[in-house]
């Protein structure tokens, strides 16, 4: 029996949904949208564990508290089949280091100049996820 992925109808639907998802991501201002399998980086849990154990997470206690599910998405959602990753450059248009040459001018932290990037990105992710779920007839977490 053929694998489901070899079925031309399934491949076409997958490819159509991938194009739709990437288009929605770009429309919401994301620079990158990639899709992979949940086990595509088998060393991820160990790397994250070592990072946290070395104290590199600083004061972000939530990283230690959630390292199991962050290291393996199947811990969070056992039925997961794909992982979607987004990237967005939320930096300023101008190089903030240019102000270093002008010590008589005040410099405001890049992160304090605009809306909190957590809120911006989260809102845009929710928009992409809502549209994708409606198109695909699927659940999104």
Label for each model-derived stretch:
Residues 1-141:
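Auxiliary alpha/beta "docking" domains used to position bulky ligands
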């Amino acid at each position: 029996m053929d694998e489901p992925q070899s079925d031309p109808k399934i491949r076409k639907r997958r490819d159509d949904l991938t194009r739709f998802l990437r288009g929605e991501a770009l429309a919401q201002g994301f620079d990158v949208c990639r899709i992979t399998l949940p086990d595509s980086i088998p060393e991820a849990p160990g790397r994250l564990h070592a990072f946290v154990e070395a104290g590199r997470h600083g004061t972000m206690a939530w990283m230690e508290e959630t390292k199991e599910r962050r290291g393996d998405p199947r811990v969070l959602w056992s039925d997961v089949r794909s992982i979607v990753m987004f990237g967005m450059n939320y930096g300023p248009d101008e190089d903030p280091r240019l102000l270093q040459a002008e010590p008589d001018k005040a410099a405001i932290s890049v992160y304090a100049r605009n809306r909190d990037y957590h809120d911006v990105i989260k809102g845009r992710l929710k928009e992409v996820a809502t549209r994708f779920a409606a198109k695909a007839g699927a659940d999104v977490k």
